[in-house]
Design a protein with these regions (language model features):
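Walker A/P-loop NTP-binding active-site region of P-loop NTPases
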Residues: 395
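Aromatic sugar-binding interfaces of carbohydrate-active proteins
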Residues: 388, 404-443
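Short, surface-exposed polybasic-and-hydrophobic patches located at secondary-structure transitions
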Residues: 298-318
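Substrate-binding/charge-relay-adjacent region of secreted/lumenal peptidase catalytic domains
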Residues: 27-289, 313, 317-383, 389, ...
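Bacterial signal peptide processing site
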Residues: 21-24
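Short acidic, Gly/Pro-enriched loop/turn segments at secondary-structure junctions
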Residues: 218, 293-301
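C-terminal motif of bacterial Sec signal peptides marking the signal peptidase cleavage site
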Residues: 16-19
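Bacterial N-terminal signal peptides that target proteins for export
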Residues: 1-9
Length: 465
């Protein structure tokens, strides 16, 4: 399978190969060839269609793979990234001549320039010297080299361990020994590649601290979050979650530290019958997911609730490889004083959202991802609320206001004029066994203003952060 830019061949050579093969992996990659069922997806009414949609329609059975299976052990956390297995990022014509910092090199996967445009971010002028931490389980031996390749291909400044821009430590904060890599059933290497690339895409001037924990037990990952704060990170992304098990945890209430966590990829019912921790904690910013598409409007982009459950290729219920953003009304966490939606009397999830759909994925480079045919083709389309989590963490780092934050209160107080409201879509589909765990309509359905799947919407600049 051709997966875009080769690691060892020049870009121009890959373009020649793409041209010889018709420019795509499969004719069905063209949005105009997608099935009528797929075309019926809920999308903003102003969304562009055809090739301009930047869409990568699902092709064949099981088009998506969850990187981490849902565990029956409540002490294990699930990573919340997903990857396309049927199609891959396809190079745009003339990609070898374009400036990747100004024009995306892929036709069907998003680059940093797309995300910066969609969310009106001053990514090239802000963030210098700020430290963003990514806390993930297990090892990833090629983290530094894969990140270096991604950043070079995307026109971003270099960020490596030699320049102290990138620092990789274990859960105790030491550079060695680093954990071993996870087994084949838990692809935390893919999770880490997505996280590193998304932080880089949003805040290329930021420094990055990658904390690799011994395993994906709750105790290990929580220890990693504590270590991230101790080592000076003011912005921490947690792209994983599990069932609510109790009240707040003090590790996630670190003064002057913004912690963002993923709302989940299992829709409004979730695998756990509601919201998940740590996203539902009082002092955590809970990030939901959207489907971001080019649009006929002044912004140039539009968003709906991320819901890939509505397609017949995705299977049924908890076995579905496809996903939708999580949401919920907590059963464990008391409502924060700054949350003022009226029907959920406990903590409402989510607070904010960003792109997560696998139909319009983000481009990620990973030389260790299964099925990529590396070393000659290592680009993949990724999604899930892991992506939105690290995007939002990067936005907070650009804003640089960690000292004034307490959970998501600034978003709830300052959203007017500084967020793009998402008013289309929902995160359920009874036809595939996913129903809303709450009787409160807005917990699973988008509306004007706050709703569970997308919170107050997606960033419109930095004013709410």
């Amino acid at each position: 399978m051709n997966r875009g830019i080769a690691r060892v061949l020049p870009l121009a050579a890959i373009l020649v190969l793409a041209a010889c093969s018709g420019g795509s992996i499969n004719p069905s990659l063209n949005p105009q060839n997608s099935s009528a069922n797929e075309q019926s997806a809920v999308a903003p009414p102003d969304a562009l269609t055809g090739p301009a949609s930047r869409e990568a329609p699902f092709v064949g059975a099981n088009p998506v793979r969850r990187l981490c299976p849902t565990s029956v052990d409540p002490q294990l956390m699930e990573c919340l990234a997903m990857v396309r297995t049927d199609v891959a990022p396809t190079l745009s014509a003339g990609a070898d001549l374009a400036d990747p910092a100004k024009t995306c090199i892929f036709t069907n996967a998003y680059c940093p320039v797309d995300l910066q445009s969609a969310y009106a971010l001053p990514s090239l002028s802000k963030g210098a010297g700020r430290l963003v931490a990514i806390v993930d389980a297990w090892g990833y031996h090629h983290a530094a080299s894969d990140l270096a390749y991604y950043r070079k291909a995307m026109g971003l400044k270099a960020c490596g361990t030699g320049t102290k821009c990138l620092r990789i430590v274990n859960q105790n904060g030491n550079p060695s020994p680093l954990p071993r890599e996870s087994g084949p059933s838990d692809d935390w290497k893919g999770e880490q590649s997505l996280d590193l690339d998304m932080v880089s895409a949003i805040c290329p001037n930021c420094k990055i601290l990658l904390v690799q924990t011994d395993n994906n037990y709750t105790s290990s990952l929580y220890a990693g979050v504590k270590t991230a704060g101790r080592l000076g990170a003011k912005y921490v992304g947690a792209s994983w979650g599990g069932p609510e098990s109790g009240g707040d945890n003090s590790i996630f209430h670190q003064r002057g530290v913004v912690i963002v966590a993923a709302a989940g990829d299992n829709g409004g019912g979730g695998h756990y019958g509601g919201p998940q921790e740590p996203c539902s904690y009082t002092y955590v910013v809970c990030a939901g997911g959207t489907r971001l598409v080019p649009a006929h409007n002044a912004r140039g982009w539009s968003e709906s609730v991320w819901n890939d459950l509505t397609f017949d290729r995705c299977g049924f219920g908890g076995s579905s490889p496809c996903g939708a953003t999580g949401s919920g009304c907590s059963r464990k966490i008391v409502k924060p004083s700054w949350q003022h939606d009226t029907l959920c009397h406990m903590r409402s999830e989510s607070d904010v959202s960003a792109t997560a759909s696998l139909r319009n994925p983000v481009a990620v480079y990973n030389s260790e991802e299964p099925g990529g045919g590396c070393p000659t083709s290592c680009w993949f389309g990724f999604g899930g609320t892991s992506a939105s989590t690290q995007i939002i963490s990067g936005v907070y780092a650009l804003a640089g206001n960690a000292a004034t934050q307490a959970g998501a209160q600034n978003i709830w107080r300052n959203h007017t004029g500084h967020m793009s409201d998402v008013t289309v879509g929902n995160n359920i589909d009874p036809g595939v066994g996913v129903t809303c765990a709450s009787t409160i309509h807005y917990i699973c359905y988008a509306r004007i203003g706050f709703d569970g799947p997308t919170g107050w919407g997606s960033p419109k600049g930095l004013g709410a952060f």
